[in-house]
């Protein structure tokens, strides 16, 4: 199975700061998908097919990458962006998730 490694595991950012987190796949995948999860809630699809913004996801979010290297970027951190972000692939069975990047707000 394809192992997804997210980096960093935990990070903090101030309001307005640019944020980038990465997801590395153990083998090449066609697309990467990203989910946002806030404490006590179910994960929400945030970015799909590497770079397409899901419904409800703000335009300050973007995704990029190919093969084994993918990233999620927030151009300007907002308080509501504090959450855990998971990458996911289904190019190869079984579907797998990364362990997540926890993004905290630095005040």
UniProtKB/Swiss-Prot annotation:
Annotated Gene Ontology cellular component terms: immunoglobulin complex
Location of region: Framework-2: 34-48
UniProt cross-references to SMART domains, sorted A to Z: IG, IGv
This protein's record includes keyword S-adenosyl-L-methionine: no
Region (Complementarity-determining-2): 49-55
Pfam (any one): V-set
Keywords, sorted A to Z: Adaptive immunity, Disulfide bond, Hybridoma, Immunity, Immunoglobulin
SUPFAM superfamilies found in the cross-reference section: Immunoglobulin (SSF48726)
Alphabetized InterPro entries for the sequence: Ig-like_dom, Ig-like_dom_sf, Ig-like_fold, Ig_sub, Ig_V-set, IgV_Light_Chain
Region Complementarity-determining-1, annotated ranges: 24-33
GO biological process: adaptive immune response; immune response
Location of the region described as Framework-1 in the Swiss-Prot/TrEMBL record: 1-23
Lineage: superkingdom: Eukaryota
Signal peptide location: none
Region ranges (Complementarity-determining-3): 88-96
Intrachain S-S bonds: 23-87
Region (Framework-3): 56-87
Region (Framework-4): 97-106
PANTHER family assigned: IMMUNOGLOBULIN LIGHT CHAIN
Known role: Anti-2-phenyl oxazolone (PHOX) Antibody.
Name of the protein described by the UniProt record: Ig kappa chain V-VI region NQ6-8.3.1
Organism encoding this protein: Mus musculus
């Amino acid at each position: 199975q394809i192992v997804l490694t997210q980096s960093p595991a935990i990070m903090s950012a101030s309001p307005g700061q640019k944020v980038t987190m990465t997801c590395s796949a153990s083998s090449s995948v066609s697309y990467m998908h990203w989910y946002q999860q806030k404490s006590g809630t179910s994960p929400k699809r945030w970015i799909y097919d590497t770079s397409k913004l899901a419904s409800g996801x703000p335009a300050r979010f973007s995704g990029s990458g190919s093969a084994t290297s993918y990233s999620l970027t927030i151009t300007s951190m907002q308080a509501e962006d504090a959450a855990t972000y998971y990458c996911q692939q289904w190019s190869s069975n079984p579907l797998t998730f990364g362990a997540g990047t926890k993004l905290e707000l630095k005040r």
